[in-house]
């Protein structure tokens, strides 16, 4: 026994607990916990029964309402003996009538909400092509497939056309025209501003141009010779074999081996200087080199944009074929004062 427990206050006023040992107190604690759990469970079960009673009554009322029309239809009685819903509702209390009326109103609302979802017509343009790819569908959906495929193809064509307009800055009056008529409308109504690159909206640079491969003297000689043969006729090999050998030797491509020797540029500024350049000399060399690049760029621009001569006689052409097509059609303009050529500061 513990002597210090005599002054301990017990809320339950059970003084016998002070005389119990530790094991006995633990057993009492276990029993008390078990009793508390059982009583709490009993209270919860009682509350559930109380809550389920109104629901059971309401369920009985609904079942009675459903069975009432069936019984009235089976018994072929007169119109005065048939019970309507209003007559049935008068047999119950006011609370029950309100609850049944609310349930009936909710059911009607559910039907009205679901009706638009069921009767909504599907959008034919948003249907996937994979829906028509099943062999189980047969030939019934053939017309739908054609309409859907035509819609998809037109949408792709319109997307490509819009991308081309954004790229070239084209604004057509008839946006519904297809891509073959796109360039015709541009030619009739619009001119491209070649003071800057219409594709990049920036100043021209040297890399926007490339040498024309059709301008080589050998190919030009071949074209002239073919034009001459078309008018006069080719000579026979037996009589003019020596002439044909000479022509074949002239038309060979050995001249392309040293093509860069014919177009050699001058030495860059400061190339022959033996000592290191000063700051002023370095800046002057940079300005001179930038001026050389500017002259080359302008020369290439003048050659590529000259539509008065045929394309095969232009020494330089644009690297983008779209620009060459615009030059051939003549739907562009530029001025020497507004021409922008990139110059590094």
UniProtKB/Swiss-Prot annotation:
Its EC number is 3.1.-.-. Its main location: cytoplasm. The modification Phosphoserine is found at residues 143, 267. Changing residue 75 to A: Reduces DNA damage-induced phosphorylation. Residues 265-290 are annotated as: Disordered. The keyword DNA damage applies. One of its GO terms (biological process) is meiotic DNA double-strand break processing. Changing residue 249 to A: Reduces DNA damage-induced phosphorylation. Abolishes DNA damage-induced phosphorylation and function in DNA repair. The keyword Nucleus applies. It is found in: Cytoplasm; Nucleus. Keywords: Cytoplasm, DNA damage, DNA repair, DNA-binding, Endonuclease, Hydrolase, Meiosis, Nuclease, Nucleus, Phosphoprotein. InterPro entries: Ctp1_C (IPR013882). Changing residue 279 to A: Reduces DNA damage-induced phosphorylation. Abolishes DNA damage-induced phosphorylation and function in DNA repair. Changing residue 267 to A: Leads to camptothecin hypersensitivity and loss of function. Residues 21-172 are annotated as: DNA-binding. Changing residue 223 to A: Leads to camptothecin hypersensitivity and loss of function. Changing residue 76 to A: Reduces DNA damage-induced phosphorylation. Pfam families: SAE2. Disulfide bonds: none annotated. Changing residue 278 to A: Reduces DNA damage-induced phosphorylation. Dimer or multimer. Interacts with MRE11. Present with 1030 molecules/cell in log phase SD medium. Belongs to the COM1/SAE2/CtIP family. Endonuclease that cooperates with the MRX complex in processing meiotic and mitotic double-strand breaks by allowing the endonucleolytic removal of SPO11 from the break sites and ensuring both resection and intrachromosomal association of the broken ends. Required for proper recovery from checkpoint-mediated cell cycle arrest after DNA damage. MRX complex and SAE2 remove a small oligonucleotide(s) from the DNA ends to form an early intermediate which is rapidly processed by EXO1 and/or SGS1 to generate extensive tracts of single-stranded DNA that serve as substrate for RAD51. This is DNA endonuclease SAE2. It comes from Saccharomyces cerevisiae (strain ATCC 204508 / S288c) (Baker's yeast).
């Amino acid at each position: 026994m513990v002597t210090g427990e005599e002054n301990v206050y017990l809320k339950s006023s059970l003084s016998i607990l002070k005389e119990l040992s530790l094991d006995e107190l633990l057993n009492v604690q276990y029993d008390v916990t078990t009793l508390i759990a059982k009583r709490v469970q009993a209270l919860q079960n009682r509350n559930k029964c109380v809550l389920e009673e109104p629901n059971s009554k309401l369920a009985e009322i609904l079942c009675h309402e459903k069975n009432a029309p069936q019984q009235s239809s089976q018994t072929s009685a007169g119109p005065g003996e048939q019970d309507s819903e209003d007559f049935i509702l008068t047999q119950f209390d006011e609370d029950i009538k309100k609850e049944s009326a609310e349930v009936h109103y909710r059911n009607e609302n559910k039907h009205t909400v679901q009706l638009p979802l069921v009767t909504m017509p599907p959008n034919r343009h948003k249907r996937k092509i994979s829906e028509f790819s099943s062999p189980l569908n047969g030939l019934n959906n053939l017309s739908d497939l054609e309409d859907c495929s035509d819609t998809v193809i037109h949408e792709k064509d319109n997307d490509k056309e819009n991308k081309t307009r954004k790229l070239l800055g084209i604004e057509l009056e008839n946006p519904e025209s297809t891509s073959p008529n796109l360039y015709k409308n541009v030619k009739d109504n619009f001119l491209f501003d070649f003071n800057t690159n219409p594709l990049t909206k920036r100043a021209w640079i040297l890399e926007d141009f490339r040498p024309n491969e059709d301008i080589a003297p050998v190919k030009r000689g071949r074209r002239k010779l073919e034009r001459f043969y078309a008018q006069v006729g080719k000579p026979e090999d037996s009589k003019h074999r020596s002439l044909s050998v000479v022509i074949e030797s002239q038309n060979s491509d050995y001249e392309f081996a040293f093509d860069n020797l014919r177009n050699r540029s001058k030495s860059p500024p400061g190339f022959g200087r033996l000592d290191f350049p000063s700051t002023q000399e370095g800046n002057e060399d940079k300005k001179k080199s930038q001026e050389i690049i500017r002259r080359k760029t302008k020369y290439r621009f003048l050659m590529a944009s000259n539509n008065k001569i045929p394309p095969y006689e232009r020494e330089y052409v644009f690297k983008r074929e779209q620009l060459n097509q615009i030059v051939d059609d003549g739907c562009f303009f530029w001025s020497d004062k507004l021409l922008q050529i990139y110059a590094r500061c």
